[in-house]
């Protein structure tokens, strides 16, 4: 059995290009250098705490308060960074065809934002508005009896606070977009939304409605 569950995200397409969102070099640096370093740092930090070795990065981040005060913030930073990136890479598809939400997800977006088109617009504008060095999140609400989606923004590698449950994230650190999009974060956000596996997003929403 592996000692740690801390590994860089593994997109469905490996580390190849995800055009027009990111070229191969950007993806390779993003996964192996940026996230790889976070994984290496976290393994060192939790080495003496076996109870943490089998946990996912998100759970380690949320349970960092159980660790000695001296390393808590470093653990939150490294574990949070890994978790943020897992939500970024989770639904990305490598083919260059445009992907749009299906009927069911479009209905949830309509209920939450007015329409799927309105959601795309709001998401792009929020990405433009945010300063670099954080994440833009699409979340569900744990206290809502009807599935509703909300946007949340976080600085650094922080995760959204309760009652928000992360669904996916947009990385707004410069390493994710600067090479292909410069400062045009609206275009970057649009490219991201059109490379998502919306059927997989739908499956996650269904699982949450069923208590999964």
Walk through the language-model features, giving the residues of each.
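Feature for soluble, non-membrane regions of globular proteins
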Residues: 1-212
